[in-house]
UniProtKB/Swiss-Prot annotation:
The gene is rplR. This is one of the proteins that bind and probably mediate the attachment of the 5S RNA into the large ribosomal subunit, where it forms part of the central protuberance. It comes from the Bacteria. Belongs to the universal ribosomal protein uL18 family. This is Large ribosomal subunit protein uL18. GO terms for cellular component: cytosolic large ribosomal subunit. InterPro entries: Ribosomal_uL18_bac-type, Ribosomal_uL18_bac/euk. Keywords: Ribonucleoprotein, Ribosomal protein, RNA-binding, rRNA-binding. GO terms for biological process: translation. It comes from Deinococcus deserti (strain DSM 17065 / CIP 109153 / LMG 22923 / VCD115). Pfam families: Ribosomal_L18p.
């Protein structure tokens, strides 16, 4: 039952991202039990514009580390000239580490 809910949530989120994407690159989030990874992907060209992960960035607990990853990603994106993205949370709820990463990316200058 939990797996079906997760799959439905993922498909619902992806559908919304596809509709909203248009001309904007996608900020994709992957969360494991130890780390969190985020990358900005240009789906038209199939290239990764910027990436950051907690394997490189460390800061206190998992939520603080996720916020540091969001800030690092925003800095890398602004260096490449990316200001607007579509947030792709995947199957993860917008809560905890995912929310901390998104909030820090917004504070860093990304618009979504």
């Amino acid at each position: 039952m939990a797996a079906q809910t997760s799959i439905r949530r993922k498909l619902r989120a992806r559908r919304k991202v596809r509709i909203a994407a248009g001309e904007r690159p996608r900020l994709s989030v992957f969360r494991s039990s130890k780390h969190i990874y985020a990358q900005i992907i240009d789906d038209k060209n199939g290239t990764t514009l910027a990436a950051a992960s907690s394997a490189v960035v460390k800061a206190g607990n998992k939520t603080d580390t996720a916020a540091a990853v969001g800030k690092a990603l925003a800095e890398a994106a602004s260096a490449k000239g990316v200001k607007q993205v579509v947030f792709d949370r995947g199957q993860y709820k917008y809560h905890g580490r995912v929310k901390a990463l998104a909030d820090a990316a917004r504070e860093g200058g990304l618009d979504f």
